């Protein structure tokens, strides 16, 4: 089994609440202890725009995975869960993919998924998911806020501000994508 990469350099968070699903990510790219770029775009719409996702890990590896996920979405009629499972199968069996160092959060109207560096597909509990170096900070903050009146985007912004205050590899230059949710 391959060793999981050390995640440093980003925080990605997703919250599903009140008929919306939001994926938000910071823009910091770090090489060691140096900030190389403060405003990278690690969150984007995929395929025809019905799926949104964000990545943590090696940028080139993440774009490879985004491209492959988009192909799987095309092959499976835009069904995110099916496309993610098929990508995970490839990830586990393809020698090249097994060496990629990236994780992703992807979401559509129906489901939010975490795709791990081991080829796992996880559906988070309570509609909140986070990855990356500041992921645990953002996840904790979002879970604490989700039961209150705030909407999904407000929760994401506040949780990311907390993560940026606590994680030196996370900043407050945010990219946000939102979809209407079935739930």
Curated annotation (Swiss-Prot):
Catalytically driven reaction(s): ATP-dependent cleavage of peptide bonds with broad specificity
BP term (GO), one: proteolysis involved in protein catabolic process
Keywords assigned by UniProt, alphabetized: Allosteric enzyme, Cytoplasm, Hydrolase, Metal-binding, Protease, Sodium, Threonine protease
Chain sites annotated for binding Na(+): 164, 167, 170
Enzyme Commission number(s) from the entry: 3.4.25.2
PROSITE patterns: PROTEASOME_BETA_2
Main subcellular location: cytoplasm
Annotated compartments: Cytoplasm
Activity control summary: Allosterically activated by HslU binding.
MF terms (GO), sorted A to Z: metal ion binding; threonine-type endopeptidase activity
GO cellular component: HslUV protease complex; proteasome core complex
Alphabetized Gene3D superfamilies for the sequence: Glutamine Phosphoribosylpyrophosphate, subunit 1, domain 1
Active site residues per record: 10
Quaternary organization: A double ring-shaped homohexamer of HslV is capped on each side by a ring-shaped HslU homohexamer. The assembly of the HslU/HslV complex is dependent on binding of ATP.
Family classification: Belongs to the peptidase T1B family. HslV subfamily.
Known function: Protease subunit of a proteasome-like degradation complex believed to be a general protein degrading machinery.
Protein name from the UniProt record: ATP-dependent protease subunit HslV
Species this protein is from: Rhizorhabdus wittichii (strain DSM 6014 / CCUG 31198 / JCM 15750 / NBRC 105917 / EY 4224 / RW1) (Sphingomonas wittichii)
Lineage summary: Bacteria, Pseudomonadati, Pseudomonadota, Alphaproteobacteria, Sphingomonadales
């Amino acid at each position: 089994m391959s060793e999981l990469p050390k995640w440093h350099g980003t925080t990605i968070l997703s919250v599903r609440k009140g008929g919306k699903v939001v994926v938000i990510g910071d823009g910091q790219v770090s090489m060691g202890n140096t900030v190389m770029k403060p405003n990278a775009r690690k969150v984007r719409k995929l395929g025809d725009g019905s799926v949104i996702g964000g990545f943590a890990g090696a940028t080139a590896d993440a774009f490879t995975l985004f491209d492959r996920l988009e192909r799987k979405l095309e092959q499976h009629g835009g069904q995110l869960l099916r496309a993610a499972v098929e990508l995970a199968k490839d990830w586990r069996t393809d020698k090249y993919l097994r060496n990629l160092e990236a994780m992703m959060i992807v979401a559509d109207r129906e489901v939010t998924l975490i795709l791990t560096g081991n080829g796992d597909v996880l559906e988070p509990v309570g509609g909140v998911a986070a990855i990356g170096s500041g992921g645990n900070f953002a996840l904790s903050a979002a879970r604490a806020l989700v039961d209150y009146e705030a909407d999904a985007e407000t929760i994401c912004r506040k949780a990311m501000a907390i993560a940026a205050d606590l994680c030196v590899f996370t900043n407050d230059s945010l990219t946000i994508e939102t979809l209407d949710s079935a739930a």
